[in-house]
Amino acid sequence: MELQFLGTGAGQPAKHRNVSSLVLKLLDEINEVWMFDCGEGTQRQILETTIKPRKIKKIFITHLHGDHIFGLPGFLSSRAFQASEEQTDLEIYGPVGIKSYVTNSIRISGSKLPYQIHYHEFDDTSMGKILETDKFIVYAERLAHTIFCMGYRVVQKDLEGTLDAEALRAVGVPFGPLFGKVKNGQDIELEDGTKIFAKDFISEPRKGKIITIIGDTRKTSASVRLAKDADVLVHESTYGKGDERMARNHGHSTNMQAAQIARDAGAKRLLLNHVSARFLGRDCRQMEKDAATIFENVKVVRDLEEVII
């Protein structure tokens, strides 16, 4: 499970940062990639990665400001250029209006998509659990931006315990159907009468990962709820220390406020994203240093950076 940041800038493209988009790679888990936001130039950024567009099965949009959606029609059109046997349907989750935006863009431009898009639109009345699969649950809450904006909490369901094959062989269980029974939690009895209890050879279930992705927002308690005990919190950091008034006026957060959210939520790691173009290398290091006075495990991410979860 990995995050890769396709665009980490705020507002408009800059030489060193593209606008918002990131992907959650779930290739080992479910052989899918999930995208969060798709700002202008996202498809160009994908060319610099190993990401295959056909693997992107779900797109989650935080809000309808241009720096988060202007790359979507282009990406969807380019995704249509794959070989026919590679075409797969796509699901888009986002605020009310995302379907109209995409369908009108495709219609007006005369584009043809040889795959189906299934839309899931949300407003204040439909927050909470928005998706559940065999292995993941996704929750959403409204944040505090200048327009309706959502934050997402991706929860991996607990993983099954692993079978201690060596220990099983050591007590005389031959590899084959009996192994499968024990792995499935069934107790067995060997030919000599020895009873084998599955619980003695299967480890405890492992807790799944929690990834929280916060869209544009002022500091809000909704972010704390979404980030509760998260393994990774991706939080916007448009502004730096001392810019709290400006951040509030424009519906954004500072690095210090993001650190406070991570601390209050009990998150394990904080990745600062959506950084203003005025912050260059030295400034970003200072942003990290300042935020670390509140929450130690913090990093300002860069375009194309990959983070293993």
Curated annotation (Swiss-Prot):
Binding site for Zn(2+) 1: 63, 65, 145, 216
EC number(s) per entry: 3.1.26.11
Reaction(s) catalysed (UniProt annotation): Endonucleolytic cleavage of RNA, removing extra 3' nucleotides from tRNA precursor, generating 3' termini of tRNAs. A 3'-hydroxy group is left at the tRNA terminus and a 5'-phosphoryl group is left at the trailer molecule
Keywords for this protein: Endonuclease, Hydrolase, Metal-binding, Nuclease, tRNA processing, Zinc
Cofactor(s) annotated in UniProt: Zn(2+)
Cofactor binding note of this UniProt entry: Binds 2 Zn(2+) ions.
Active site, renumbered: 67 (proton acceptor)
Listed Pfam families: Lactamase_B, Lactamase_B_2
One Gene Ontology MF term: zinc ion binding
Amino-acid positions noted as binding Zn(2+) 2 in the UniProt annotation, renumbered to this chain: 67-68, 216, 274
EC class name: hydrolase
Subunit structure: Homodimer.
Family that this chain belongs to: Belongs to the RNase Z family.
Function of the protein: Zinc phosphodiesterase, which displays some tRNA 3'-processing endonuclease activity. Probably involved in tRNA maturation, by removing a 3'-trailer from precursor tRNA.
Protein name: Ribonuclease Z
Organism annotation: Streptococcus equi subsp. equi (strain 4047)
Lineage: Bacteria, Bacillati, Bacillota, Bacilli, Lactobacillales
